[in-house]
């Protein structure tokens, strides 16, 4: 998608995915994505009657995000292992005094993780582990190093198979 705008610059986004099954029940996914967009409107203009947060961010550059990654999926336990790398140029952020800034050097992020679903009848447990590291400019984008998530849910057909319900925690 490409959009040319007079007020907020250009917008460009490409999403490229490749999926194949080299061996039965094993799936390989690869992706290369790119996005170049003007910073969010929240960074450009904000006024406040409560605090001195009145600013107008001039000469902002497009923030560009490049992503490369992939995953391997296994039918066994509905498992997926993934790895991603992000490079963010002109990263836009608010500094210590709440003024918008853009980074002069890129922010680089690496991620690895996995996802699995275990099922017993109509009961399911989905777990996800996600490790990530901000490789450069950690002070601009503080992210947790580890994210873990688990969902336990019940899933069944209802109303003579006319609907499906899912509930859980």
Q: What is each residue range found by the language model?
A:
Residues 1-169:
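Exposed, low-structure sequence patches enriched in small/polar residues
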């Amino acid at each position: 998608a490409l959009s040319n705008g007079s007020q907020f610059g250009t917008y460009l986004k490409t999403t490229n995915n490749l999926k194949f099954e080299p061996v039965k029940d094993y799936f390989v996914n690869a992706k290369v994505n790119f996005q170049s967009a003007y910073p969010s409107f929240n960074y450009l203009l904000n006024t406040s009657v409560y605090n001195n947060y009145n600013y107008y961010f001039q000469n902002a550059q497009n923030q560009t995000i490049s992503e490369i990654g992939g995953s391997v999926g296994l039918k066994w336990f509905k498992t997926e292992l993934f790895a991603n790398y992000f490079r963010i140029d002109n990263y836009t952020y608010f500094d210590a005094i709440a003024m918008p800034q853009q980074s002069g050097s890129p922010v680089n992020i690496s991620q690895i993780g996995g996802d699995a679903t275990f099922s017993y009848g109509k009961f399911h447990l989905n777990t996800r582990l996600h490790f990530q590291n901000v490789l450069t400019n950690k002070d601009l984008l503080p992210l947790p190093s580890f994210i873990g998530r688990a969902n336990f849910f019940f899933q069944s057909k209802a109303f003579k198979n006319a609907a499906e319900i899912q509930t859980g925690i």
